[in-house]
UniProtKB/Swiss-Prot annotation:
It comes from Albidiferax ferrireducens (strain ATCC BAA-621 / DSM 15236 / T118) (Rhodoferax ferrireducens). Belongs to the type-I 3-dehydroquinase family. It holds the Pfam family DHquinase_I. It is an enzyme of class 4 (lyase). Coiled coil: none annotated. It catalyses: 3-dehydroquinate = 3-dehydroshikimate + H2O. The gene is aroD. SUPFAM superfamilies: Aldolase (SSF51569). 3-dehydroquinate binds at E50, W51, R52, R86, R217, S236, Q240. The active site is at H148, K175. InterPro entries: Aldolase_TIM, DHquinase_I, Type-I_3-dehydroquinase. This is 3-dehydroquinate dehydratase.
Amino acid sequence: MQSSKPIESHGQPIAGGKLPLICVPLVGHTLDEVMAELAIVLPKKPDVLEWRVDFFESIGDVAAVIAAAKAIKSKAGDIPLLFTRRSVMEGGEKIALNEDQVIALYGAVCESKAIDLIDYEMANETANIAQVRAAAKSNDIKLVLSFHNFSSTPGLEALASKFLMADQLGADIAKVAVMPRDPNDVLILLAATQQASQKLRIPLISMSMGPYGSLTRLFGWAFGSALTFAVGARSSAPGQVPIEDLNTVLGILRKAMGDGQTTP
């Protein structure tokens, strides 16, 4: 029934190809805060961890960022780590780095091999995307090219073009997150996801945000989204559901839909 393509890391499907994967964000401002979050999150057994480095107050210190990434990875063990700088324009925190410095940071973190996946926004210049893609590919790191709209939901064709753009730009995974104004917007996002999952060669991640959009975090996988985000300690976006609640609902949905998978 699912049309989702599993997300891989280092040549293997994450969590044995489980769909959807559950990703929990880490949003601490200091390494101590991040490690405290990690202590809360790890017992809840997420499939992927996302480190939102735009929250990290030492983001301008490349050595400190790499050391923190290695510390997270050491504690996380086999759980893949997604490294993300979210821009202010797409819902992230304000940082004191220009885009050239961000790209240099991405390159250094990729070379450190302390991460498994990296997120970069497809709104960036094509040349910048190419640099990040090259750094990721040369270090066996999967590239997520993402698009976020925190004010509205574009039309079906516009959303479809975003998924296609990520594929054309060389992404390993395409991510689209939008804000619905009504239930119809949620249906548009799900329809775009289903269409894209049938046409594209790469896995997709999609979600509507906010109260209406929380539904997509629960059953978007049935329409082709391979991963969903959940709250482990602190939320990084509106509409995220606590991981415990998400696991419960996913278990019920899988059983109802005849899926043999079980939640951890």
